[in-house]
Amino acid sequence: MMYKELCGEKISRLGMGNMRLPTIDGRNGPIDEAKAQEIIDYLMAAGVNYYDTAYMYHGGKSEIFVGKALSKYPRDRYFLADKMPSYPLEEGRTPQEIFEEQLKKCGTDHFDFYLLHNLCEDSVPVFTDPKKGVIPYLLEQKKNGRIRHFGLSSHAKPETLKAFLDQYDFFEFVQLQLNYLDWEMQDAKQQYEIVTNYGVPVWVMEPCRGGRLASLTPEADKLLTDCDPGRSVASWAFRYVMSLPNVGVILSGMTQMDQAENNVETFSEGKYLTGQEQKVLNQALEQFRSQVIVPCTACHYCDGCPMELEIPDILKLYNRYSLSKSPMIHMDVAELAHGPADCIGCGACASKCPQHIAIPEIMAKFAEGLKTLPKPKMNP
């Protein structure tokens, strides 16, 4: 396992994100604790020592599970990371109430790493509101040893991130959405450079973009597998961010054991991309981007649609539709409780989207496209 000295700690380059744990009966079902525990046990045995959770993951159940799953191990064998959410603060809860609840749910007396969650244009006023006192409270907890290292995760625009870091000079690390697709498309390069110039390491979230970079298009996949038949397509995404000099921890959400095994293999070999491999990856990316892709990561920040649309599921289908125009998409859409045609265009989802996707416009385009897409021919 690869390790790196970060914030004075020896941390595994691979960290486990706990936003997409295996579940029972679909995404909205309860966490499959037996499978999730098996994955954590495997990662612990492989030397992974960084585990990330958050208040909102799995409807508030991720923190409870992670605390329980790690409780079988000595507390000094792993680093536990959690985050301060902005939404409950907007609703009137205090940072103290939230922080104390998180400690209790995780069954710990301190967090090794603690972050402001989802810095963005909407959350900056909440985190910096002097009446709420979020940052002073968390700095006090750090002084008292209940937070060992203080950082932030960001989906903000580059100018917002820079202004925030210019104002506050005490953050020890910054977590960014970083992958080879977003390097240009979502200004990840500019954000990476801002944090690097600030002088602190970058933690990576969405290195495989919610699994989207685990398989590109058949043509793009072939470019990568022909270059190195022994590697998975997903491993290229991890090796890309691993090769960036200021990247520290790289988080991966692992819902299946084979994903964990593949990641451990990648991070045990620790092979950075060569110049030739980077050229091949650029060719594969160009082929992939030539298709119509909506950059959804299935983070579910858009949950709560007034028409009860499962927006990430629909956007996933839209990408499949865009890539193939297969009549079978009709069957997949029919399985949804509510389809793209049910969108009323209110825009509530778009205002929450960290990827700044124009969701109502995509829904309208998808619904219109389905009207002209031939229905599948069924055998008699």
Residue ranges and their predicted role:
Residues 1-78, 137, 143:
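N-terminal binding-site loop/beta-alpha segment at the start of enzyme catalytic domains
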Residues 2, 35, 39, 62-69, ...:
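A general structural detector for well-ordered alpha-helical segments in enzyme core domains, enriched
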Residues 24, 89-205, 218-222, 228-229, ...:
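Glycine/proline-rich, positively charged
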Residues 42, 46, 105-106, 145, ...:
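Structural motif
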Residues 44, 48-49, 68, 190-380:
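Structured C-terminal cap/extension of enzyme domains
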Residues 50-57, 148-152, 175-176, 249-251, ...:
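Short catalytic-loop micro-motif centered on adjacent basic/acidic residues
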Residues 52-53, 82, 204:
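Hydrophobic residues in well-ordered beta-strands that form the structural core
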Residues 57, 73-92, 96, 117-120:
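Structural motif corresponding to the early beta-alpha repeats
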